[in-house]
């Protein structure tokens, strides 16, 4: 009830009035029944603009820390995240990953929409990074349609380190800042029912994950990087160049 009220009367009107997000492919969202929405992750505001774009409620996993802050500020933050359909998830790995999987399956089992970012964290540089196979395991076990989604230009209005999106953006080569309209592109559902019962096969999981990431890349137009985003962030933090640590492509190997 809180989600529907705040989305309809507060979050959605403000987001649509100020940023006028461009939304395509809404016809690919089923009117009823479960589906897994998989999206690239460019900015904090992805979890605002995607729920605003889709008429049905989307449940997203979020860091449990967002729901456990102290004092009035902590309560307000927790209320905000719940208002945009997010639930607390321990993302520390191991058993926590299994708990996250089970939570997603429970949501889908209720016939709802569950959203997930296969990259596991926000892109450090606007490129699309290698997907984690948990998304494939969830898709195969749940047996639901997988709907690829591309968030576009959200990193421009909501750069790393910021929480509140900017209304106008100053870009290199332009004298005056301009209004950047974020985009939400929703692709056609992917069907992985042919892999039923194969959720323990790591080769199948990687193949399904890569197919999902390819669909997202086609929608977003992003460059794909064969490295986990978490690893890329570690390299940047250490002052290293991400591209120096990428495996050479087949064409590069032949050329040398």
Question: Locations of the language-model features?
Answer:
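Non-catalytic C-terminal accessory region of glycerolipid acyltransferases
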Residues: 2, 98-256
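Residue-level signature of transmembrane alpha-helical entry/exit and packing/kink sites
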Residues: 4-8
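A generic local structural motif
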Residues: 9, 21-26, 46-47, 74, ...
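Helix-to-loop junction immediately C-terminal to a conserved catalytic motif
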Residues: 9-41
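Short, basic, glycine/proline-bearing loop/turn elements
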Residues: 10-12, 83-91, 118-122
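A generic structural signal for well-ordered alpha-helical segments
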Residues: 14, 80-81, 107, 139
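Short gly/ser/thr-rich secondary-structure transition/capping motifs
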Residues: 16-23, 96-98, 166-169
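Catalytic core of membrane glycerolipid acyltransferases/transacylases, capturing the structured
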Residues: 29-94, 99
